[in-house]
Amino acid sequence: MFHEAVTHRPAYHTDPFFLQSDAMRKLVAATAQQADLALIEGAMGFYDGIGQTSEASAYTVSQWLETPAVLVVNPQKMGRSVAAICKGFLQLEPHNRIAGFLLNRVRSGMATYYQEIIERETGLPVYGYLPELLEVQLPSRHLGLYTAEEVDTLQEKIDLLGETARKTIVLERLQALAETAPPLPLPELPSMPPHSFRLGVAKDAAFCFYYAENLELLQRNGAELVFFSPLTDSALPEQLDGLYLGGGYPELYLPQLSGNHAFLESLRTAAQKQLPIFAECGGFLYLQQSIQDAQGKIFPMAGLLSGTATMGNRLCRFGYVTMTAQQDTLCAEKGAVIRAHSFHYADSTENGTAFSVQRPNGRTWLEVQQQGSILAGFPHWYFPSCPEAAQRFAEQCRRYQKRRNNGCRF
């Protein structure tokens, strides 16, 4: 969300757990066609992958895309030791693509000092630094940073960072470095098909976590995306053929969500008509009978699924998962395999049994509810890892549309 706020472009996931190398190269080539620079952020440390390996790490991404990597280094409270850190990264995997460094949270008077040490010891350039700017620091909470929409004066913070970077980072050298990456072959993508069904997508402060690739893949299967807000709307949009309730922070808006009786009634009416509904994480919580907050107060919710949810103070089933359908469901036939990610502090008395879920370390359990026309659970699905899931969801929506247009009773 912050990437999109800064660039005014969709942000995509170059994640080796979700994508094979060819698919990742096609994704980057296709989405960067209209850009001068494709900037890829490593979410954790450069070599931090699955388990104790570098598998599916930022290092893997740089290898697959053949792109140079610039390490961001925080050298506070260090002297020459910063060179040991930099050299350690260079030596851990000898065939890495590390091409230089950026210094973070460094006083202007110390930047040259660190730059000289690093360049002398590693032989690689330091492209500049960013000082510590208290004015742009962002607050955090249990699921990470606040969302871009919640940050006051966000544009002013972005502007200040940009103005500072122009003064302290040699941006022209970074641009020249990026141009050393070999071109990626452009995939032949068909044009977007005409809309064949209307898909409602919850999008507000409570429901804001979606993979852009999921929405685009649904569009490529004919979806017209119709955005709405469970927080502020009094009813679902008209003439919908399906619903997608994504993740977010519903636990921060429990009084508003629970108190929007008109919208909840509209949602229940749609569910009674067997409208296809796919819900992830926060959307799954919203469909429960109730949610109990961290203080023990219970808020009634949509009541479309069996089970009640409780907010906790520790992560539940966090990380990458591979899911295998144990039955035919809204988005997957029995036996279908899709990759996903879980990141939540809530738990439910009824997590479901529609999918067998496996962590990379081999741990398995059952999860995800399939009730009537509703498929819902905690994992965030990545549709490109199983395009048939998006196709099946789209087909179910078109079947509903056909029944609706024929005036069938539900």
Identify the residue ranges that each predicted region occupies.
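A short helix->loop->beta-strand "cap" motif at the edges of active sites that frequently abuts
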Residues: 67, 124, 272-276
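Hydrophobic/aromatic ligand-binding patch that stacks against planar heteroaromatic rings
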Residues: 60-61, 118, 217, 269
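Internal gly/pro-rich beta-alpha loop/helix module
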Residues: 79-191
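Cysteine-nucleophile active-site neighborhood
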Residues: 250-329
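ATP-dependent carboxylate-amine ligase catalytic core
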Residues: 1-65, 69, 73-97, 109-112
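C-terminal and late-domain segments of enzyme folds
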Residues: 62, 167-168, 193-195, 207-219, ...
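Phosphate-binding active sites in nucleotide-utilizing proteins
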Residues: 196-272
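Structural motif
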Residues: 39-41, 70-72, 102, 244-246, ...
